[in-house]
Amino acid sequence: MYYGFDMGGTKIELGVFDENLQRIWHKRVPTPREDYPQLLQILRDLTEEADTYCGVQGSVGIGIPGLPNADDGTVFTANVPSAMGQPLQADLSRLIQREVRIDNDANCFALSEAWDPEFRTYPTVLGLILGTGVGGGLIVNGSIVSGRNHITGEFGHFRLPVDALDILGADIPRVPCGCGHRGCIENYISGRGFEWMYSHFYQHTLPATDIIAHYAAGEPKAVAHVERFMDVLAVCLGNLLTMLDPHLVVVGGGLSNFEKIYQELPKRLPAHLLRVARLPRIEKARYGDSGGVRGAAFLHLAEK
């Protein structure tokens, strides 16, 4: 059995998956914001409850909104202050008497998609999240590529490419980013960036859902905005595809529901790839909100 915890700022969700990778049980509880011993106790209690339900000890994986530190075993997770800077993996492993694996929740999203029955046929899967920010994960032969600092999937912190400046104008503001730099692509091609770009060019603020509705109705400003956005998205993704060369790209996050992305990217991407490059398959994510739990559970699958 595979147990996956999705640990967020307000809730902890546990999903239990059987040997056929089907979810058979789940439970959700509030996240203790400040009390680390209480957090450990909740994770222990949920694990033992799952053991009782299954009649066996399952493997345990945890997805966090942050990064594990490979050097000292602590976690950096600002959204869960109770776990910030704590050796969560070692402490929980000791409590439940089994190995615990921890990874970034965006990596868990990518892993969940890569273990889809159909998507498993692709050796290299790029999970791309276009949500409040931009992130994701790279999966090779069913395993997460974490990198030295667990930041392989921090795609949103590439800077705007030169070709994007040709589209947006050389004087486009280099938007300050939460990472401390300016001009990171997540401030332009995320859901938030989609809205910012519209506001910048038209001095009018609208939520993404309204912009997309205006686009569907043929409103000229919205149409021009979507065309511009798709061009910038293709430029940025073209750089990413040239670097990583995946067989499959799976798109998640709020903007993944904008179906125009899957129509336009295959048309626009070739201009930004090497001539010998073949386009990867580009698909919408299949597991939605359950992807974090599912991917966390599957952190133990690569060894099979």
From Swiss-Prot:
Binding site for ATP: 4-11, 133-140
Species per Swiss-Prot/TrEMBL record: Yersinia pseudotuberculosis serotype IB (strain PB1/+)
Its EC number(s): 2.7.1.59
Protein name: N-acetyl-D-glucosamine kinase
One GO term of the biological process aspect: peptidoglycan turnover
InterPro entries assigned: ATPase_NBD (IPR043129), N-acetyl-D-glucosamine_kinase (IPR023505), ROK (IPR000600), ROK_cs (IPR049874)
GO terms assigned for molecular function: ATP binding; N-acetylglucosamine kinase activity; zinc ion binding
Similarity comment: family membership: Belongs to the ROK (NagC/XylR) family. NagK subfamily.
Protein task: Catalyzes the phosphorylation of N-acetyl-D-glucosamine (GlcNAc) derived from cell-wall degradation, yielding GlcNAc-6-P.
PANTHER family documented for this protein: N-ACETYL-D-GLUCOSAMINE KINASE (PTHR18964:SF162), ROK (REPRESSOR, ORF, KINASE) FAMILY (PTHR18964)
Pathway: Cell wall biogenesis; peptidoglycan recycling
Residue numbers binding Zn(2+): H157, C177, C179, C184
